[in-house]
């Protein structure tokens, strides 16, 4: 038997003298506090005495993570559920950025760039540039907000002085550019800017104020076309990514384009930077927290990843895939089923036209929250507590793509606000407050929208001025208006002759002229003759107007789709309402439906253009026919014989 040390012998004797502890099911708060204190003071002794967890530790509940001052941080973020204002471009808006010098810059698909100045409440227009002859591929603003650049498929880069809103340089690149980014920091001798070639992995570094000759070329850093280039101004490092999922760290001219020395890793195997390649995805958006320590990305697999910049280790992953939203809708309904289906169709179209690459992510000024657009609206995520704390624009009929966040006070005052001024009851000083604003671009719209802390005054009124018409109508719109002044093409009543009886309707040509014109011209031309009611849902509606009878066909009298015409006095507030069927916003063709119950959830989604005045019993009989439960198509065809327009 081995000899025992003195301390082992004393401990063994103590164990023998200790009485057997009674079983405890619960501990009082005082006992719990004392036990925790004793366990902390005598860690070494406890480790020798016990094998496994202490009884007190086993009863400790895991505390929920809380972000201190979260309410204060949220007070400085937009909170309105609906957008306050929207402004126009001539074409679909694709990009938006916000500068530290209180400017908002928007770019549209036709190569135009607009400068807007943030004021105390809202924004004001500053200047309009025809920047490129073709499509704008990417825009970027410098870290201090002094310089802005854009690249387009006209093989050119335009450089602007933001504060003086003037174009100061133009570079002829000689290749089709893909991405661009200012990679200099305040104090650097050269205002360097990076641009990538769209079809290869090459990165060219230029002097933004210089000539067309590149200062440096990265030709082996990436082997696939680049998807993002972003500067971390705190650590003076650049992060770039390509379509193969590879992510690289590098520096600009002051550090001779080498690997940054201030990061805490040397080999990628020590990081999670291969995560995208493992998932066969790539980043479509990259941004950094204000302190430079966090990096947020959105991937082509629709996952949001939050990582530590210095170590490259993953912190959080948020799944925003379509399958996740479908499961969420099934578990707990987020939207009405029809609206959810419409938004899912928009998401699939996003993927079809590769517009997912335009969705971006931004940090707030604290670095505790990220904001990005989803099919439910703009999500505000607390990355510390792993919770979605707010959704902006859930009620709106827009799919948010790019967004820019402004926080702070736009109007600069001559004197700084002192403690005495803050404590005073001066009403003028009390009016000086922050106006946090999210400026976002939607999918396939020529407007950009602003979410603030203020809800719009009246969204249902036709005279609501939250949508500002700051652009002149196009030539096509003028011609369409001129043609409408010719022979009368519309009427205020029609009779739909069906195989089950006649339906008399009243139309609204004043409130929705284009929709009524489309219906009347189609009816006069015999377009609807022989069309079946291809979709009938008992207790909801009957739908027709598709020449194919599948629900996928039909077009307008202009040979395509036309825009919605919502009016405050025309609602789905009663049965026997005529309304246009669509596949999303501004996709009206020839299909229409007649409701058999009030359907208020369809307001501002489908254009109401008529009411049934006689023949309600015919509509009811049609809605009660037997249908295929899977397709809602009647077993025996009910068809339109013809439509008489009075």
UniProtKB/Swiss-Prot annotation:
Key words of the record: Acetylation, Isomerase, mRNA processing, mRNA splicing, Nucleus, Repeat, Rotamase, Spliceosome, WD repeat
Domain (PPIase cyclophilin-type): residue spans on this chain: 490-645
Localization in the cell: Nucleus
GO biological process entries: mRNA processing; RNA splicing
Catalytic activity: [protein]-peptidylproline (omega=180) = [protein]-peptidylproline (omega=0)
Organism: Pongo abelii (Sumatran orangutan)
Keyword Transcription: no
Activity regulation information from UniProt: Inhibited by cyclosporin A (CsA).
Record-linked InterPro entries: Cyclophilin-like_dom_sf, Cyclophilin-type_PPIase_dom, Cyclophilin_A-like, WD40/YVTN_repeat-like_dom_sf, WD40_repeat_dom_sf, WD40_rpt
GO molecular function: peptidyl-prolyl cis-trans isomerase activity
The EC number(s) this enzyme carries: 5.2.1.8
Family membership: Belongs to the cyclophilin-type PPIase family. PPIL1 subfamily.
Region (Disordered): 1-30, 455-490
UniProt protein name: Peptidylprolyl isomerase domain and WD repeat-containing protein 1
Compositional bias ranges of the Basic and acidic residues kind: 17-30, 455-478
Any one of the GO CC terms: spliceosomal complex
Positions of post-translational N-acetylalanine modification: 2
UniProt-listed PANTHER family: PEPTIDYL-PROLYL CIS-TRANS ISOMERASE-RELATED (PTHR45625), PEPTIDYLPROLYL ISOMERASE DOMAIN AND WD REPEAT-CONTAINING PROTEIN 1 (PTHR45625:SF4)
Enzyme class: isomerase
Residue ranges of WD repeats: 88-126, 131-170, 221-260, 278-319
């Amino acid at each position: 038997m081995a000899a025992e040390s003195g301390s082992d012998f004393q401990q063994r004797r103590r164990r023998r003298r200790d009485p057997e502890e009674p079983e405890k099911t619960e501990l009082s708060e005082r006992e719990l506090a004392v036990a925790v204190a004793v366990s902390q003071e005598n860690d070494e002794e406890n480790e020798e005495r016990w094998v496994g967890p202490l009884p007190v530790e086993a009863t400790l509940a895991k505390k929920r993570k809380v972000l201190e001052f979260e309410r204060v941080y949220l007070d400085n973020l937009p909170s309105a559920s609906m957008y306050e204002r929207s402004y126009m471009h001539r074409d679909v808006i694709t990009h938006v950025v916000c500068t530290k010098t209180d400017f908002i810059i928007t770019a549209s698909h036709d190569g135009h760039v607009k400068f807007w100045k943030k004021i105390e409440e809202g924004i004001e227009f500053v200047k309009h540039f025809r920047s490129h002859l073709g499509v704008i591929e990417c825009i970027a603003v410098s870290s201090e907000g002094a310089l802005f650049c854009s690249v387009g498929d006209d093989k050119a880069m335009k450089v602007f002085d933001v504060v003086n809103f003037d174009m100061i340089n133009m570079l002829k690149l000689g290749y089709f550019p893909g991405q661009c980014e200012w990679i200099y920091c305040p104090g650097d001798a050269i205002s360097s800017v990076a641009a990538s070639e769209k079809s290869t992995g090459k990165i060219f570094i230029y002097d933004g104020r210089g000539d067309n000759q590149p200062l440096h070329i990265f030709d082996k850093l990436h082997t696939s076309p680049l998807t993002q280039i972003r500067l971390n101004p705190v650590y003076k490092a650049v992060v770039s990514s390509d379509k193969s999922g590879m992510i690289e760290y590098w520096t600009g001219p002051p550090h001779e384009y080498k690997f940054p020395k201030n990061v805490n890793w040397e080999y990628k195997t020590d990081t999670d930077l291969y995560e995208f390649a493992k998932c066969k995805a790539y980043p479509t958006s990259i941004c950094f927290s204000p302190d430079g320590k966090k990096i947020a990305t959105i991937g082509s697999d629709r996952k949001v990843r939050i990582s530590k910049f210095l170590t490259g280790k993953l912190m959080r992953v948020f799944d925003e895939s379509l399958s996740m939203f479908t499961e969420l809708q099934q578990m707990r309904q987020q939207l009405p089923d029809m609206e959810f289906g419409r938004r899912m169709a928009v998401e699939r179209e996003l993927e079809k036209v590769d517009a997912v690459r335009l969705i971006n992510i931004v940090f707030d000024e604290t670095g505790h929250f990220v904001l990005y657009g989803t099919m439910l609206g703009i999500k505000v995520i607390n990355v510390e507590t792993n919770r979605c704390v707010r959704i902006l624009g859930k009620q709106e009929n827009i799919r948010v793509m790019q967004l820019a966040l402004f926080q702070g006070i736009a109007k600069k005052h001559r004197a700084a606000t002192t403690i005495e001024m803050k404590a005073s009851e001066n009403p003028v000083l009390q009016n000086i407050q922050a106006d946090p604003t999210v400026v976002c671009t939607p999918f396939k719209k020529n407007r950009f929208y602003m979410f603030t802390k203020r809800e719009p005054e009246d969204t249902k009124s036709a005279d609501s001025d939250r949508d500002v018409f700051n652009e002149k109508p196009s030539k096509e719109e003028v011609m369409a208006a001129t043609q409408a002044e010719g022979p009368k093409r519309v009427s205020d009543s029609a009779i739909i002759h069906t195989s089950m009886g006649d339906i008399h309707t009243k139309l609204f040509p004043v409130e929705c002229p284009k929709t009524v014109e489309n219906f009347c011209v189609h009816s006069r031309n015999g377009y609807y003759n022989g069309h079946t009611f291809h979709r009938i849902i008992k207790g909801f509606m009957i739908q027709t107007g598709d020449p194919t009878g599948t629900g996928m066909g039909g077009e307008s009298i202009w040979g395509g789709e036309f825009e919605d015409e919502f009016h405050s006095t025309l609602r789905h507030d009663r049965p026997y309402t005529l309304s246009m069927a669509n596949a999303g916003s501004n996709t009206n063709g020839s299909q229409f439906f007649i409701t058999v119950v009030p359907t208020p959830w369809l307001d501002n989604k489908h254009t109401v253009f008529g009411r049934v005045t006689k023949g309600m019993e015919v509509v009811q009989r049609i809605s009660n026919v037997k249908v295929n439960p899977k397709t809602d198509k009647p077993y025996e065809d009910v068809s339109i014989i013809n439509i008489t327009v009075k």
